[in-house]
Amino acid sequence: MGSPLQVLSDWEGWQQKSSNGLQGVREHYSWQAHAVRYLEVVRPIIDKTEALVRQPPRTRRAMLYHDRAIFTDLDQNLLGDPKSLAILVKVLRENRKCATFGIATGRRLESALKVMKQYGILEPDVLITSGGTEIHYAPKLTQDRGWPRHIEYHWAPSAVRRVLDQLPGLELQPRTEQSRFKISYYIDPRNAPGLDEINKLLHQEELSVTVNLSFGQFLDVLPIRASKGFALRYFAHRWDIPLEHVLAAGGSGADEDMMRGNTLAAVVANRHDEELSQLVDMDRIYFAKQSYAGGILEALDHYDFYNNCTVPSADGTV
């Protein structure tokens, strides 16, 4: 090989040895070489292994083939007009192979199921309950276990109650209306602080929460990561449904964040105007002329939901 001095003084020889060294590094120490060698070692093991048949979870059902979804509130949208509800149920059932049907409600699971059975509402593919703190999937009402782990971040219910229980105009609702991630009050607007003031008081105590007011009389406090809108977006992301293909229909303040952003949004005519006043000037939100389920049917037609599924242009075409 020669002494170091001879190698350094022989420029052509040095160049050759340098080239050989770089080639050796590429052949034996590069990531590509490592990967090739690794595969050579594990290939015999792989060849002897029986392949597993990958099957989708049972709860996914036909949703695997859905490319769009419709979410609606329960009380404000589906109850109140039996004739329109019967037509809507028929339409949803006829299109179930291509579109997910979801209900998002402030009710607890047991209460929502009871009302759905009473009014003949078909079983949804997805049921978001307790204001967006629980997600269940048909056909066995399987609970999404990842959602509670996500929303428990910075949740301190005892501290929240210490702040709110002492305020005038707030009365804690019965235990049946409370849940792990939802604290519910009756609110008397004549005596209670405004929503902004309540949020300010909680913020001063370093409590990060979501506060929802519904129908001017129900106040729900949830973890900062929980709401109907957050739960809807979590579902859409997990099941790979574009928000642009999600129709969200609501009518109260608790539904507002479902209808913001890129969803196809619809507000039924029997809405709570004061709570949804900030949505009036938003382009992507359709304000239906009909109430309850009739307003949802109107929105399905407006967005051509089962065909083009898009926001109409200024001239009314899609």
Q: Model-derived features: where do they sit?
A:
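Two-component system phosphotransfer/interaction surface
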Residues: 1-9, 35-43, 297-304
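Mg2+-dependent phosphoryl-transfer enzymes with acidic/Ser/Thr/Gly-rich catalytic loops
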Residues: 85, 222, 229-318
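Conserved acidic, metal-coordinating active-site core of Asp-based
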Residues: 159-261
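A short, well-ordered alpha-helix in the C-terminal region of glycosyltransferases
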Residues: 6, 13-28
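Asp-based phosphoryl-transfer active-site loop
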Residues: 63-83, 259
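C-terminal alpha-helical cap of glycosyltransferases
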Residues: 6, 31-60
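Active-site phosphate-binding/coordination module
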Residues: 86-175, 270
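Pol beta-like nucleotidyltransferase catalytic core
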Residues: 19-22, 34-41, 283
